[in-house]
């Protein structure tokens, strides 16, 4: 895999944490997964989502997040999936399973549909 491919954010790349930020209102560390492709446009899209999600779960549960800057210490963790289109029924089943697993590990999970801004 090329260096550029490893560094490209998005659900298609499980080797990258797309974004880590603080949500001061919720007092949470947010690990963002970004899916810019419409659901169902790539045959292995759900497998890619699984791989990305599992990487994020491992990053948190294996203690890698805890080694980050101190402002993340003692904060709740939310994994957030921002996607370009609403999920279909197949995708929603998978997202619900991810949410349920996250909750079982005392993590939060949120899915949001992001709407592209009209440049005009």
Residue ranges, per PLM feature:
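N-terminal intrinsically disordered, cationic/polar leader segments
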Residues: 5-21, 96-100, 104, 111-113
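Acidic, aromatic-enriched beta-alpha/helix-loop junctions
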Residues: 43-67
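Helix-rich interaction surfaces within compact, conserved domain-sized segments
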Residues: 78-120
């Amino acid at each position: 895999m090329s260096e550029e491919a490893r560094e490209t954010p998005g659900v298609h790349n499980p080797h990258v944490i797309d974004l880590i930020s603080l949500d001061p209102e919720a007092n949470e560390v947010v690990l963002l997964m970004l899916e810019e492709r419409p659901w169902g446009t790539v045959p292995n899209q759900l497998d890619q989502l699984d791989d990305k999600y599992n990487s994020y779960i491992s990053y948190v549960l294996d203690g890698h997040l805890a080694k980050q800057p101190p402002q993340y210490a003692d904060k709740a963790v939310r994994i957030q999936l921002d996607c370009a289109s609403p999920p279909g029924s197949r995708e929603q089943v998978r997202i619900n399973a991810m949410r349920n697993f996250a909750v079982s590990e005392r993590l939060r999970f949120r899915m949001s549909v992001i709407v592209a801004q009209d440049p005009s």
